[in-house]
Curated annotation (Swiss-Prot):
Together with its co-chaperonin GroES, plays an essential role in assisting protein folding. The GroEL-GroES system forms a nano-cage that allows encapsulation of the non-native substrate proteins and provides a physical environment optimized to promote and accelerate protein folding. Residues 524-543 are annotated as: Disordered. ATP binds at T29, L30, G31, P32, K50, D86, G87, T88, T89, T90, G414, D493. The lineage of its organism: Bacteria, Pseudomonadati, Thermodesulfobacteriota, Syntrophobacteria, Syntrophobacterales. It is found in: Cytoplasm. GO terms for cellular component: cytoplasm. InterPro entries: Chaperonin_Cpn60_CS, Cpn60/GroEL, Cpn60/GroEL/TCP-1, GroEL-like_apical_dom_sf, GROEL-like_equatorial_sf, TCP-1-like_intermed_sf. One of its GO terms (biological process) is protein refolding. Its EC number is 5.6.1.7. It catalyses: ATP + H2O + a folded polypeptide = ADP + phosphate + an unfolded polypeptide. The keyword Nucleotide-binding applies. The gene is groEL1. This is Chaperonin GroEL 1.
Length: 543
């Protein structure tokens, strides 16, 4: 396949054009008075969003060289979203500014490699300064403020997220779902919950709610299928004498074993319920071990040399209550040994640190939360599906931002944190083109504050100069169009988001500045449709 190449100024101009097209579409969404972007979908109605990364991901340009520039900035937004969960629009604006200023200097004869070194040194100084400015989140109120800002100044979302974090802790799992109703609600599940319900509806104890409630039950955890009744009989006889309820967790319970359990339940001989084991493969084994440690039981497994027919009461787990519906099982207050539980938690934390897979990390964090905190579910409600999707995206953004704030602390919002780093850059001594690279970063750090002011209908440069003339958290609150102490006003950003946005923007922009040649495939020309069959009279085709 033949390729087309462009060099030098033409290459950088094409890149800049692509960067500008994408960044101009994204930056209108920045700040409390940022505008929405409407995106056409192949199926269904259009999507309305104010989320930078959602806009960026939809942009694909016709010109192949311009598209490369757009895709590289899209990578900045995506990477920032993956690492910090928010700050995608800020990262895009910073990338555009660094590349725009840098490409002018390269065109004027500056050395791109020296510029790159200067940019990298300047960014490191800013990152260190941000860490100095950063303050840890003190209370639920500050967490709510971070959530509110990230959810485009929606205090309802901020408060719900703060309440969820307060209830399940820093490591608790918070999931976001679409609600059936109009209201946005929070439900907290205490204890360990896994997504397996009862195998047979005949086990139900509350027909109105279609739930099974077991008080002070014993728990039999079996790795394999149970289909033969005679294997179960010895342990069932011991439990029947005690008169306590029993929960059986196994790969499956079927045939004769299931029929016998159902008959005994209906007769009232045995208060029992059976559920399938959660997860698959190795993850299933790990989750069964988690349940065993949480409840103080044993996993009945041939690998461990324990057979079902030889199980005693000491091998069974215990809990205060277990609630089972058709989809979920919740174990509350397991009777496991505290030290064993702490050891398991340490082991899972180590695995989280060592894993390189995002999917595995997410699953390990879910397991950790089930062991230590519990699970909170935020159900997002709205009047229409379009509004619900937009609101759900805002809730997810706000959730990521609050997690980042708890992790690394907070800095003043509204682009002020970047402006407060300018003093540290002024104290850095660099020579030649490296100094020009530092000046590029200085100029770029003003852009987020300038854009927030412009989106609010103010003169950006005037606002930036006024904020630069003051110190600390003094800044412009675009929501009220007032100058004030932003931390007191609740306009705060997570340090992790602010830091990650700059690092990713500088990394990609500096790479683009050192580009000297671009290569792409030559677009194929569509050939006309083949001519029709000649020589036949009108209407003389085949029937």
């Amino acid at each position: 396949m033949a390729k087309q190449l462009i060099y030098d100024v033409k290459a950088r101009e094409a890149l800049l054009s692509g960067v500008n097209i994408l960044a101009d579409a994204v930056k209108v969404t920045l700040g409390p008075k940022g505008r929405n972007v409407v995106i056409e979908k192949a199926f269904g109605g259009p999507t309305v969003t104010k989320d930078g990364v959602t806009v960026a991901k939809e942009i694909e340009l016709e010109d192949k060289f311009e598209n490369m520039g757009a895709q590289m900035v899209k990578e900045v937004a995506s990477k920032t979203s993956d690492v910090a969960g928010d700050g995608t629009t800020t990262a895009t604006i910073l990338a555009q500014s660094i590349y725009y200023e840098g490409s002018k200097l390269v065109a004027a004869g500056a050395n791109p490699m020296a510029l790159k070194r200067g940019i990298e040194k300047a960014v490191q100084v800013v990152v260190d300064e941000l860490k100095k400015i950063s303050k840890p989140t003190k209370d639920q109120k500050e967490i709510a403020q971070v959530g509110t800002i990230s959810a485009n100044n929606d205090p309802t979302i901020g408060n719900i997220i703060a309440e969820a974090m307060n209830k399940v802790g820093k490591e608790g799992v918070i999931t976001v779902e679409e609600a059936k109703a109009m209201e946005t609600t929070l439900e907290v599940v205490e204890g360990m919950q896994f997504d397996r319900g009862y195998i047979s509806p005949y086990f139900v104890t509350d027909p109105e709610k279609m739930e099974v409630l077991l008080n002070e039950p014993l728990i039999l955890i079996n790795e394999k299928k149970i289909s033969n009744m005679k294997d179960l009989l010895p342990v069932l006889e011991q439990i029947a004498k005690m008169g306590r309820p029993l929960l059986i967790i196994a790969e499956d319970v079927e045939g004769e074993a299931l029929a016998t359990l159902v008959v005994n339940k209906l007769r009232g001989t045995l208060h029992v319920c059976a559920v399938k084991a959660p997860g698959f493969g190795d993850r299933r084994k790990a989750m069964l071990d988690d349940i065993a440690i949480l409840t103080g039981g044993q996993v009945i497994s041939e690998e461990k040399g324990i057979k079902l027919e030889s199980v005693g009461l000491n091998d069974l787990g215990k809990a205060k209550t277990i609630r089972i519906d058709k989809d979920n099982t919740t174990i509350v207050d397991g009777a496991g040994d505290r030290k064993a539980l702490e050891g398991r938690v340490r082991q899972i934390r180590t695995q989280i640190d060592e894993t390189t897979s995002d999917y595995d990390r997410e699953k390990l964090q879910e397991r950790l939360a089930k062991m230590v905190g519990g699970v909170a579910v935020i159900s997002v409600g709205a009047a229409t599906e379009t509004e619900m999707k937009e609101k759900k995206a805002r809730v997810e953004d706000a959730l990521n931002a609050t997690r980042a704030a708890v992790e690394e602390g907070i800095v003043p919002g509204g682009g002020v944190a970047y402006l407060r780093c300018l003093g540290a850059l002024g104290a850095v001594n660099l020579e030649g083109d490296e100094k020009l690279g530092l000046n590029i970063v200085k100029r770029a750090l003003e852009e987020p504050a300038r854009q927030i002011a412009m989106n609010a209908g103010e003169e950006g440069s005037v606002i930036v100069q006024r904020v630069k003339s003051e110190t600390g958290a003094f800044g412009f609150d675009a929501e009220t169009s007032q100058f004030c102490d932003l931390i007191e006003a609740g306009v705060i950003d997570p340090t992790k988001v602010t830091r990650t946005a700059l690092l990713n923007a500088a990394s990609v922009s500096a790479l683009m500045l050192t580009t000297e040649c671009m290569v792409s495939e030559i677009p194929k020309e569509d050939k006309g449709a083949p001519a029709g069959m000649g020589g036949m009279p009108p209407g003389g085709g085949m029937y």
